[in-house]
């Protein structure tokens, strides 16, 4: 249907229809009807931001258990990552809790860390260490374990982990 000489009454393909596009099945702009490659291959690679550390059960000597919980993100790429609209989730008891949506303009430099703290006390405690600190808007971490997920602004999972309190 995308060819210039498309004939809806045709009953066989005589090879005269040329549909220019991408023939690489791994590309975002792949078109299964393409008959001629136009070298427009388009790939999308998610930034390499990982959930690097989860501090889910701080010692009570620090104060309230929830105050000092955090998760640490790390950009393992060699370029800065734009985290605008990214979302961090934690799942406890089968319920997915939205913990943070990153504001527009949030970036994480190559090789840099970022801390997502559960409370204002955590933001204060971890904020002076030379990296960005954000306060999560809901939830805290389960001491017995749960699933954590970092998703891009379109809901694609960038990184996800499961942790538990059992010995390895």
Q: Language-model segments: what does each one mean?
A:
Residues 44-168:
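Activation on beta-sandwich/Ig-like modules and their edge loops
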Residues 1-50:
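Primarily marks secretory-pathway-exposed extracellular/lumenal segments that are disulfide-
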